[in-house]
Curated annotation (Swiss-Prot):
SUPFAM superfamilies in the cross-refs: VC0467-like
Similarity-based family: Belongs to the UPF0301 (AlgH) family.
GO annotation, cellular component aspect: cytosol
Organism lineage: Bacteria, Pseudomonadati, Pseudomonadota, Gammaproteobacteria, Candidatus Palibaumannia
Species name: Baumannia cicadellinicola subsp. Homalodisca coagulata
The name this protein goes by in its record: UPF0301 protein BCI_0481
Annotated Pfam families: DUF179
Length: 187
């Protein structure tokens, strides 16, 4: 099982504050473990414009299709001082890895320097930190029904309102995740 370019959808029983009602985009998954970015937990009052200001990058706003007021996300509890940019494919960035034909992840700031130019990716999602699983850990969590999984899509990743991503991802499976109960009983 390879869940690269899939979403993990937190089950309602997951109560850890970092992952409660979360959607995680899996960037890599192999025999060594998995790495993903939470895509629906924005950092309060921190936007792409804030990141650019902090990095002393002055965006060119005359051609900006990327919204500078979009939120920055808490991608997970690991390396939360590092930036990770998920974006639609565009060549020429220093530290990029292809996730799928529709998405890449970049950890170098050169992708941010292209915002507002014809070299910018069509869509971006900026996160601080990432979520990681050691070998076998994610598989164990899946067997414990901690997560639902679906193939990822760019509509949810980039265009769905942040507050609706958890429900929208579950809806692809044909379920209303709000109707799943947190407890089971015995007859």
């Amino acid at each position: 099982m390879n869940l690269q370019h899939h979403f993990l959808i937190a089950m309602p029983t997951l109560t850890d504050p970092l992952f409660k009602q979360s959607v995680v985009y899996i960037c890599t998954h192999n025999h060594e473990g998995a790495m993903g970015i939470v895509i629906n937990k924005p950092v309060e009052q921190f936007t792409v414009a804030s990141v650019l200001h902090k990095l002393k990058i002055i965006p060119i706003v005359d051609h900006a299709s990327v919204q500078l007021n979009q939120p920055v996300f808490l991608g997970g509890p690991l390396a939360d001082d590092r930036g990770f940019i998920i974006h639609t494919p565009k060549d020429g960035f220093g530290a990029s890895i292809g996730i799928s034909p529709q998405t890449m992840i970049t950890t170098s700031k050169d992708v941010l320097e292209t915002l507002g130019t014809h070299n910018q990716p069509d869509d971006i999602l900026v996160a601080l930190g990432y979520s990681g699983w050691e070998e076998g850990q994610l598989e164990h969590e899946l067997r414990a029904n901690t997560w639902l999984t679906i193939p990822a899509n760019n509509q949810i990743l980039f265009a769905t309102p942040v507050s609706a991503r958890w429900q929208a991802a579950a809806k692809i499976l044909g379920i209303n995740i709000n109707n799943i109960v947190n407890q089971i009983g015995h007859a």
